[in-house]
Amino acid sequence: MVTDFIYDGLRLSDFGYAVVSFDGSRGGEVDTDSQLSYNHVSMMSGKRQPYITSTYDDPLKMEIQIGKNVCTADKSESMFNISVEDMEFLKRWLVRPHPHKLSVVGDDYLGFYWMGSFNVTEHVFGDGRIGATLEFECDAPFGYKDDVVVYGDLNADETFRYNCLSDEIGWIYPDITITVKEDGDLQIKNSDGRVTEIKNCRANEVITIDKNLQISSSSASHKIADDFNYVFYRVNNSFNSVVNTLNTNLAISYEIRYSPYAKVVIV
């Protein structure tokens, strides 16, 4: 059972709270876990309904209940009650207009995190606030694994192989930084057959392509937007193969960074 978490770099237990369960079952409940919706087309009077597309309609949602940690509570006050000021702080910390990183303390969740924000519902008993239910809504239908970084040097027409560690079949746009070591038109290939091409590169030029599909160059004179074919390099993952390749026609140094999807929930 989860007892502690870290949100936006701040740890719950440092403020005197712990993950609890008000109904005696568990501290976290999963509302949605990577549920796909399948779109069909009806054929043969409905006797066949093959899939046309599939989509994730909703983000992952999880519920955590918190209360005062009675082992560390100030014994001069009610050990269970949360003051108005403390509840204000909790809401200021947890309820944000933009997503932040949530990670759970414990070996079972080592290397996993989620991005999102909370809504807070107070629990009142008698005249005091005894805790809160935190409803966490992610920015995706699943969580993430810690960033994977691969880097090194490639000679012209040399190939580097690495594995995609994502739980989700498909592809991910990574952050990729390339230092070109010779003049020329750069071509970047993966095993999926896509070719990323950037023309008129110069030796020692640093090219950056991020996961939000933005490209930039360290060379102010290189009009890279005009020389890029807008085929972005992707990290691929199929059920039968997780192997990716990096192949370039020019000598380069490279760094590829991506966040694998993790189909893991807090329980």
Where in this protein do the model-derived segments appear?
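Intrinsically disordered, low-complexity segments enriched in serine, threonine, and glycine
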Residues: 144-267
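Polar/acidic, low-complexity leader/linker segments enriched in S/T/G and N/D
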Residues: 1-43
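Short, solvent-exposed beta-alpha or beta-beta edge segments that form flexible loop/patches at the rim
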Residues: 27-63, 119
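Solvent-exposed loop and beta-edge segments used for protein-protein assembly and interaction
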Residues: 56-60, 94-96, 126-130, 168-172, ...
